[in-house]
């Protein structure tokens, strides 16, 4: 696999992992996610001309989907990461003489509280960093530590973290052994996604502030003092004058993490003076005046009691460790990931071993290795990978350098359920009213087997099931009906074709294919002609779309659109387009000069396309213009200069767009 293909694969993987994480169902440990990001970052540094566009490393947060969307007054950004004392020292060197507060990095759900003339008027989740969800009703009902009124006039915005305390989490699970919560972080996120506060009334959350924005003179310049004056608690803050003091504070926080009543996954360093913090400004996706120091993963020892093998939507079979219960990072862990058989062999892990369980980033536990192989008793048992699929009994195959196992039986029951869940996911058909548990039950009952079967469901059929009432059944059917307008791009995502990523689907939608059937008929030669689609991806598309042709026909018969949607097409070029015939590359953070608001790079690229340009992801000899925003990378500038590419500031392009009445 060449560098370009690997970069595209990693970029698509990051999008997939982020979506799962923010849906409350993370697929990998934080450490594994960080490794994917780090590999992509290193490849882009080595091959800046191959940087993906949009670049997921320039984006923050989760897609906002619940409740009414609200645009933030200023972006809620992620924090730059640090893991070494040298990085802490470098942070202090950037701001000589400025005091810094160090506080625990809480592991919950970020919120923005907006007060106007002393009254709470809105509570909004971080969402995608630019737009979040209005959860005011839920916050008022369920979140402690949020005053309804404050003694400050004008507009005040307090940002912070809503967490479920460990004591609340343990008490809830003790009272609900049949439906325990997974961990406090997921519980906090799930609570504020509830449709009705009454359904989650026992799940109390607690708010801790970490940011404050007021009119001039509206609060103390010192962050901690400003929050306290409003009656809002902040996570314990320590004022530090230099890097040595800050590192000592970080060490103290890490040592005391198990004594806290809330989960943390690091420490935050931030300029103590609010004016200095604001003056420091931002990068494309993080504030300059703050830093997140990530702790090493928490580890505990326990006994590996058994290994089971789970089957995914593409037939991939992965080992899952079943563990003697152990308390790690604020939750009791009974299972963990083992990745694949190569990892098992490399770490020489056996059933019966005392193993190290690591909860990286305090999210997904995994087996890091054997504590001491020399102390084995001889009763330990080798972990033998299956030769048959644990779901359907068909022979398995090995693929790739990691010798990953796959079931190739398209009718495998486990794959069927996973594929149905994937079709209903947000990235695909977005059938949000039917969760995975109900999809599994409907599949077990023989009602659902293929995506097209969703569109034969009736309210009367759903009401035959226990625990589905009139309201739930109506919501399910309405959700299914809304999904009929899925279109080419999202339908292709939903069909879970191996090697065909979300990026593949987007490129096909923009390449002139009118429908999914036309893609199926295209043949490998035409597919390879599409930008960034290689022979392996083309072969996979041909093979699987040929197999799925009867399913495409059933979807059509049941009123599902497989045609390309207007939103996925290249934009119509305006008459007298100022950038006609130009190939452009956009780099850096883009902001609308009329409002000062940040503009997503894909949005700006689409505006350039309306102005007649062809947007490319990397600088080459064919590039006409490199359009630069804030924080532009030196590597792209150097390459553009070397190739003789004209470099223009975004302000010049904005002026042309405004004059052409394209914005």
From Swiss-Prot:
Q: Which UniProt keywords apply?
A: DNA damage, DNA repair, DNA replication, Ligase, Magnesium, Manganese, Metal-binding, NAD, Zinc
Q: Does the keyword Metal-binding apply?
A: yes
Q: Which GO terms describe its biological process?
A: DNA repair; DNA replication
Does this UniProt record's set of keywords contain Chloroplast? no
- According to its UniProt record, which cofactors does this protein need? Mg(2+); Mn(2+)
Enzyme superclass (EC): ligase
Q: Which GO terms describe its molecular function?
A: DNA binding; DNA ligase (NAD+) activity; metal ion binding
Record-annotated active site:
105
Sites where the protein binds Zn(2+): 389, 392, 407, 412
Q: Where does this protein hold NAD(+)?
A: 30-34, 78-79, 126, 161, 294
Q: Give the reactions, separated by semicolons, that this protein catalyses.
A: NAD(+) + (deoxyribonucleotide)n-3'-hydroxyl + 5'-phospho-(deoxyribonucleotide)m = (deoxyribonucleotide)n+m + AMP + beta-nicotinamide D-nucleotide
Pfam families named among the record's database cross-references: DNA_ligase_aden, DNA_ligase_OB, HHH_2
Q: Do you know which CDD domains this protein is assigned to?
A: BRCT_DNA_ligase_like
The UniProt entry, under InterPro entries, shows:
BRCT_dom (IPR001357), BRCT_dom_sf (IPR036420), DisA/LigA_HHH (IPR041663), DNA_ligase (IPR001679), DNA_ligase_AS (IPR018239), DNAligase_adenylation (IPR013839), DNAligase_N (IPR013840), Hlx-hairpin-Hlx_DNA-bd_motif (IPR003583)
Q: Which domain of life is it from?
A: Bacteria
Q: What does this protein do?
A: DNA ligase that catalyzes the formation of phosphodiester linkages between 5'-phosphoryl and 3'-hydroxyl groups in double-stranded DNA using NAD as a coenzyme and as the energy source for the reaction. It is essential for DNA replication and repair of damaged DNA.
Provide the family line. Belongs to the NAD-dependent DNA ligase family. LigA subfamily.
Name of the protein = DNA ligase 1
